[in-house]
């Protein structure tokens, strides 16, 4: 999802997963199941630099080998570039909710075909046309240093022998 003060990653305002199937996103958001939304906005507060990457891969294990394979070439080609961490933040917030701050917003997805198809919209109050939208915690803040330290610590843990085949 991409909400106010954020931008999309597939169109100027739509996030890929919602844009691909906004109808499914809308059904899910309106389903009443407990949801904490981790939008692009919070992920764009991450800043995976070459220095952080080098710290991650100091220890050899299957996870760091995968990181070397997937990110190593990117940092070799563009060492000055940084990368956002998306799914990793969503998962980390399940492990330690204090890594993120949230704001309660009503969230809906535009399903009208046009230039704003698949765009998620959030507001503190319900608005005309969004009847049925649910209020949910939406992640806005990220303690980047605590997050990346936890991430590095976790990926450097030894894996059980059964998973090292």
Predicted feature locations:
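Class I SAM-dependent methyltransferase SAM-binding "motif I" and its flanking Rossmann-like core
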Residues: 1-13
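Conformational coupling and interaction surfaces
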Residues: 16-23, 30, 35-165
């Amino acid at each position: 999802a991409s909400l106010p003060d954020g931008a999309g990653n597939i169109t100027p305002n739509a996030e890929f997963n919602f844009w691909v199937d906004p109808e499914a996103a809308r059904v899910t958001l309106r389903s009443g199941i407990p949801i904490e939304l981790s939008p692009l906005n919070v992920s764009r507060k991450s800043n995976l630099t070459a220095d952080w990457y080098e710290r991650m891969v100091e220890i050899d294990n299957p996870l760091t080998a995968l990181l070397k394979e997937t990110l190593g070439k990117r940092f070799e080609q563009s060492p000055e570039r940084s990368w956002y961490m998306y799914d990793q933040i969503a998962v980390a917030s399940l492990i330690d909710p204090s890594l993120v701050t949230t704001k309660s917003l009503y969230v809906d997805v535009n399903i009208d075909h046009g230039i704003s198809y698949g765009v998620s919209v959030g507001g503190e109050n319900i608005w005309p046309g969004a009847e049925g939208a649910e209020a949910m915690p939406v992640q806005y803040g990220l303690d980047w240093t605590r997050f990346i330290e936890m991430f590095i610590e976790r990926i450097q843990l030894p894996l059980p022998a059964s998973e090292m085949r």
